[in-house]
Amino acid sequence: MEYKTPFIAKKLGVSPKAVVRIAQQLNLTIEKNKYGHFIFTQDDLDQMLEYHRSQIEQSQNTHPTQKTSSNDVEELKTQVNTIVQNISSHDFEQLAAQLNTITRRLDRMEEQMQDKANDVVTYQLLQHRREMEEMLERIQKLEAGLKKEEPIYITPDTKPTYEREKKPKRRKMIFSIFGL
């Protein structure tokens, strides 16, 4: 029977990439179907299951579960403290120096960003000022043009708007067809 990679991955409880990796480690000849999918036989599946089980057993044997006593924990704490004390003074100085250089760089970058923001705002203000001056010039030209021309008088209508002629209502097309 033929099996595809996802099926074997489910059986082993690993990802499809891990299945291909296991097959390569076992030097299995993997065939591909016309779509490029890997095809495994029953023998390949059995070999991979055995290999996977042996790997799991080896990992469990190399990492046996140990019960730690309070004495062991105390010993580890003292070892860690001595290591930290020995390394601390020199490493902390290096870390402090690195931190200072990083903060200086950040300050410089913030200043540069602030300068750029100020430049952008200044440019926008100048552009708005230029636009306002152009609009002021246009208004002055229009005023001068109006002063040269004859005064324009606006005469009110003789009839108020509510007394004006009303447009005839449009009849809907269906009503006109049926003569309603």
From Swiss-Prot:
GO aspect biological process, one term: asymmetric cell division
GO cellular component, one term: cytoplasm
Segments passing through the bilayer: none
Keyword field contains Coiled coil: yes
Coiled-coil segments: 90-150
SUPFAM superfamilies referenced in this protein's UniProt entry, alphabetically: Influenza hemagglutinin (stalk) (SSF58064)
Record function comment: Required for the formation of axial filaments and for anchoring the origin regions at the cell poles in sporulating cells, thus ensuring proper chromosome segregation in the prespore. Binds in a dispersed manner throughout the chromosome but preferentially to sites clustered in the origin portion of the chromosome, causing condensation of the chromosome and its remodeling into an elongated, anchored structure.
Family designation: Belongs to the RacA family.
Stated name of the protein: Chromosome-anchoring protein RacA
